[in-house]
Amino acid sequence: DLSEPFSNHLCEHLKQNEKQITSSNSKFLNSLKKFNEGKIKLEERNEITKKLGFVNVIDAFHEVNGKTIPKRFFIDERKDSGGIRLTNHFYDLFELQESENFLNEVEARWRLVETAWKLGVAVKLVQVEHDSVGEQFFINTKLGRINVTSSKNALNGYQKSKCFFCFDYISIVKRSLKLCNVDHFFPDTLKSKDFPGYVDGIWNLVLACKECNRGEGGKFAKVPSLKLLERLYKRNEYFCSSHHPLRETIMSQTGQTKEQRTKFLQKCYNSAKKKLIHNWDVEPKGTST
C-alpha cells in the first residue's frame, strides 16, 4: 500500500511550502492540509489518497521530456487489480551502490521546484546561488535569503555518485566514509585575479572525492586539463538541454546558446592557465557516467 508513505512525504512538504502544484486548487492536497491541521484522521487521509492521490502520478511517471522511457519500473494494473505491479527494473535500482543517494537527490529537485512555485515564479526564472561554507543552494528575495537544498544533493544526479574527475564512488550521505566535497572546477583562488567567470557559480561547481579535492596529488590551485574542461562542458550542456531546475541559472552564468557557452569556457580556461600556469589531471578509478 503506497498511500501512507506517499501522503507522508507530501504532508511534510506541505508544511514547508503549501504550493505543490501549478494549478490553483486540488481536492487531494486540501485534504492533506486538513490532516496537517488535525481536522481529519490518518485512516481517512489514507483512503482519500487511494482515491485521489495517484490519478495523474502513475500515468506521468514514465514520461520524461515528452517521451516514454524504455525501462518501466511498474505496470499499471489498476483496472484489473486496483494497483500496480513492480518490475525487475525497479528492484535492480536497489542493487546499485549509489541507491543510498536516491532519496537525497529526489528531495533536492523537489525543493528547487516547490521553492519556485512558492515565490510565484516559473522554475526557469529562479536564480540559484551557492553558499560555499554551508554547501547550500539558496535564493535571494526581497524578503531575504531562502535556503533551498544541499548543493551536494542537487549536483549528484548528473554524476551518478561518481567523482567528477576520477570516477571513483562518492556519497552524499552524511557521515559516509566516501562523503564527497563540493569543488570549484576552476580554483576559488581565481576570485581575486580578474577572472571572467563567477567562480562560485553553479556552472563551476562539481562533486569530487577527497583525494582529488585535497589529497596527495589533488587539484588544489591547478587548472584542470582540456579533457576535463570538455567534461565540464558536457555536464553543463546536460543541465541546459534538460528541464532540470538549475538550467536557467547555468545559462544566465555561461551563455544562452551553445556557441556562447563554448566561448565562455574557453575564455575562462585561457585566463586560468595564464594566471595559475600548471595543469592537472588524474587517472580514472572507475568508468565514466
Regions found by a protein language model. Name each.
Residues 1-147, 223-235:
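Mixed-charge, low-complexity interaction segments
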Residues 221-289:
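C-terminal structured domain segments
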